[in-house]
């Protein structure tokens, strides 16, 4: 391995941010080791590793939004427009040696790759100022991709970005469901493949008929599309996503905090199969 930085022994009273390399290369795996001495001459050593993300100059993907006409959001349960399914199919001629996906959206999204979730995070990309900062997430997809057809799926709901209770109009930008993603694949033969959000992205309304970060979600199981995020699915009635030139890559920043995950699932206390007349439920 090439040593990119060696501080040598630094005599200082500081115990954090002592020194470091001026610039690290993007999309690069690094190992580090540090040895610390105390005032008695005793020392201890620790080693670990990290990987740098995509830099702002390396974004080649297009912002792609739903073709649906803009709908003004209103407060209240069930008043929001449906969530949007974004589907991007692509074909690989070889199994990847390394694959990283960088993704974000305007809204909140749930990612699937060939029908499987790469991790269990929820509410990505979470709440930021949007105008000045929008976080993107990094996923290791190496084990989820295969030779032949592959499918990236993103289901996007309103989240904080479109919520009338948390986000006033942002400089006149309409809060359409919009995605941005870039998949960087290193092939076994040393070649490189890039898959981006572009005109190849297809869209469809989700079975989630309305979603609000405070008021909850309205789901119609009759409208579910089994297999929509898997190879072999026929997307004949899907509409192509529309390129959104209003968005800027300059606000993108790698996520800097831990993801939101589910730590406990509460079982349902009441299940209704059929109600023949109007009924009031007190839960």
Feature roles, as predicted:
Residues 29-33, 38, 51-56, 76, ...:
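Accessory beta-strand-rich segments of carbohydrate-active enzymes
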Residues 1-29, 39-42, 63:
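Recognizes extended acidic, P/S/T-rich segments that occur
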Residues 265-272:
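Short, surface-exposed loop motifs enriched in S/T, G, D/E and P with embedded aromatic residues
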Residues 43-47:
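Extracellular and select intracellular beta-sandwich modules with Ser/Thr-enriched
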Residues 273-283:
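Single conserved hydrophobic/aromatic residue that forms the stacking wall/gate
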Residues 19, 33-34, 275:
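An aromatic-rich alpha-helical recognition segment common to small helix-rich domains
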Residues 226-261:
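Catalytic cores of secreted or luminal carbohydrate-active enzymes
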Residues 63-74:
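Short, solvent-exposed loop/edge segments of extracellular or virion-exposed proteins
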């Amino acid at each position: 391995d090439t040593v990119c930085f060696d501080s040598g022994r630094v005599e200082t009273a500081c115990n954090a941010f002592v020194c470091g390399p001026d610039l690290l290369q993007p999309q690069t795996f690094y190992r580090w080791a540090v040895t610390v001495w105390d005032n008695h001459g005793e020392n201890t050593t620790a080693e670990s590793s990290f990987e740098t993300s995509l830099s702002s100059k390396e974004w080649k993907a297009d912002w792609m939004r739903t073709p649906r006409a803009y709908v003004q959001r209103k407060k209240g349960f069930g008043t929001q427009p449906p969530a949007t399914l974004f589907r991007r199919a692509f074909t690989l001629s070889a199994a990847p040696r390394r694959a990283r996906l960088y993704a974000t959206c305007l809204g909140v999204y749930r990612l699937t790759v060939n029908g499987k979730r790469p991790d269990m995070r929820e509410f990505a990309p979470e709440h930021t100022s949007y105008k000045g900062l929008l976080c993107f997430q990094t996923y290791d997809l190496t084990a989820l991709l295969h030779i032949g057809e592959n499918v990236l799926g993103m289901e996007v709901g309103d989240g904080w970005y479109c919520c009338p209770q948390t986000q006033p109009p942002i400089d006149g930008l309409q809060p359409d469901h919009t995605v941005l993603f870039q998949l960087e694949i290193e092939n076994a033969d040393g070649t490189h493949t890039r898959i981006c959000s572009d005109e190849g992205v297809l869209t469809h309304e989700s079975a989630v008929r309305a979603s609000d970060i405070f008021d909850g979600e309205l789901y119609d199981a009759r409208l579910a599309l089994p297999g929509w995020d898997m190879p072999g699915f026929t997307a004949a009635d899907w509409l192509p996503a529309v390129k959104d030139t209003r968005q800027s890559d300059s606000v993108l920043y790698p996520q800097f905090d831990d993801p939101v995950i589910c730590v406990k699932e509460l079982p349902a206390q009441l299940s209704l199969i059929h109600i023949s007349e109007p009924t009031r439920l007190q839960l």
